Amino acid sequence: MIKQPLAACILALAFAGVHSAALAATPKETVAAFHEALTNGDKDRALAFLSPTVAIYEAGYVERSRDEYAQHHLGGDMEFARTTTRKLLKQNERIDGDTAIVWEETETTGTSRGKPVHAFGTDTMVLEKKGDGWAIVHVHWSSRKA
């Protein structure tokens, strides 16, 4: 019967779509998709771009895994991203084999928890090649008031 192989093919394509949606083709695309997921409040998609052992540095604090980030700052980061506008001022990328670094300069404006926001930021992300895509293994966020 044709129905069974067709159903299996559709199911396989659906799973392949989930994988390709989670890992973007280039380091820059991965970083952009991660920020887009934060802005859209898509927790599962944002976490899919992070290695399970990601290290996130922000304001002197360290989160040592994807699970720790999910339990602590992810919700606040999504809320902040939804209520502010992040403008990319400059972005660079360096790829060396299965490792890449993306560093950015940003300007963020808007409101967060009822207070005005205007800040300049510097972001550095280290990524590792995973199959056809990239996973974020380290994030360092830093910002200052404008």
Please state what every model-predicted region is:
Residues 35-42, 50-54, 58, 73, ...:
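Sec/Tat-exported extracytoplasmic proteins
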Residues 57, 109-111, 128, 142:
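A generic structural motif
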Residues 120-146:
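Short beta-strand edge/turn micro-motifs at domain boundaries
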Residues 50, 60, 104-108, 123, ...:
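A mature extracytoplasmic/lumenal domain signature
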Residues 62-63, 116-120:
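Short, mixed charged/polar active-site loops
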Residues 2, 9-13, 17-53, 67:
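Short, low-complexity N-terminal intrinsically disordered segments enriched in polar/charged residues
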Residues 29-30, 85-87, 122:
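Short, conserved clusters of charged catalytic residues that mark active-site
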Residues 55, 71-115:
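Surface-exposed, charged secondary-structure patches
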